[in-house]
A protein has these predicted regions:
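Formylglycine-dependent sulfatase
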Residues: 1-334
């Protein structure tokens, strides 16, 4: 009797088509490029709503936001539709072991178990990841750069002296760099730790292959802030980065299509002066534009490498012979 195939379900947060196989000659993504040669690639996809919570709720249920009623970053999906069926829940109901790690649902839009009905094994959240004592967890969940970590510690101490209860919010309101790097192992950053945990899960799953599995692995980069080990930044020459062709509003472009980049401006950094011009657009110096683009590509290559590690484990355990691999993006930027 043929066993149902396993499913490896990989989510990437905010990835645009900065992949070699999608025609980006600047991108260094050898793992996804190689995989794409054996895969079916979907080139005409459209997000239901370009906001994290609504997009993920829609994708994971196959329902439009008009149905899920998740249109923001606080509505709980099952508060509105308690019996809504998710992709992993469907597999669970049909004999699969379902488990996951990282960011699959937006945590603000599901319960604190990352949607309990979806998983037959407790979902592994970011605060359950393991980091070496050599470097510890990334500050604010993002940063391993020593200077940034020291600044975060200083601000936390300052908040404590002022009697502030939410220390991390105090730090983020005053200091949250949009990019960062450090000469540390991949596993020092959240996404490296996610890949490492996924590999352990695959190794455990390979010990008993009588039950098919649905393993969801959710990576958090290349969403802001653009943080990755230095070696991925070193893959790219900042001087070769091309800026966006259009730096102003298009002729007769509708105002609704433009905004003042509120999320970008929430990343407080003393070296960047966020200026809103007369067109209500964010003006950034060219060097900072290049820093951001550089960081985005570095993070894309970082995630590509983590996917490579997972695929290698899939192969070394023999699970690759009966596993369907899905790589998708929650939603993206143009």
């Amino acid at each position: 009797e043929t066993q149902n195939p396993n499913i490896l379900f990989i989510a990437i947060d905010d990835l645009k088509p900065t992949i070699g196989s999608f025609g980006d000659a600047f991108a260094q993504t050898p793992i996804m490029d190689a995989l794409s040669k054996e895969a079916t690639i979907f080139l005409n996809n459209h997000t239901q709503q370009a906001v994290c919570g609504p997009s993920r709720a829609s994708l994971m249920t196959g329902k439009r936001p008009d149905y899920t009623k998740v249109r923001d970053l606080k509505t709980k999906m099952r508060d509105i539709n308690p019996d809504i069926l998710t992709i992993p829940e469907h597999f669970k109901n049909n004999g699969y072991q379902t488990l996951g790690v990282g960011k699959i649902f937006d945590p603000r839009c599901v319960d604190n178990k990352r949607d309990l009905p979806s998983w037959s094994v407790p979902f592994i959240k970011e605060n359950q990841l393991v980091y070496s004592s050599d470097y510890g967890p990334p500050a604010l969940g993002y940063y391993q750069n020593k200077d940034i970590k020291n600044k975060v510690r200083q601000l936390r101490a300052e908040a404590t002296s002022k009697g502030v209860k939410n220390l991390n919010k105090y730090v983020r309101d005053n200091y949250k760099p949009p990019f960062g790097s450090a000469n540390v192992p991949d596993e020092a950053y959240t996404d490296g730790a996610i890949a490492a945990r996924a590999n352990l899960m695959l190794q455990d799953l390979s010990q008993n292959q009588s039950t098919p599995f649905f393993l969801a692995v959710g990576f958090k980069r290349p969403h802001l802030p653009f943080t990755a080990p230095q070696k991925y930044w070193d893959l790219y020459n900042k001087n070769e980065i091309e800026l966006a062709s259009y730096q102003t509003k298009s002729v007769n472009g509708p105002d609704l299509a433009y905004h003042s980049s509120g999320e970008m401006r929430s990343y407080k950094y003393p070296e960047i002066d966020y200026v809103i011009n007369e067109e209500n657009l964010l003006d950034l110096e060219e060097s900072h534009q290049k820093d951001l683009i550089h960081g985005y590509y570095a993070c894309t290559s970082f995630i590509d490498a983590q996917i490579g590690k997972i695929l290698q484990t899939l192969k070394s355990t023999g699970l690759d012979k009966n596993t369907i691999i899905v790589i998708y993006v929650s939603y993206t930027h143009l």
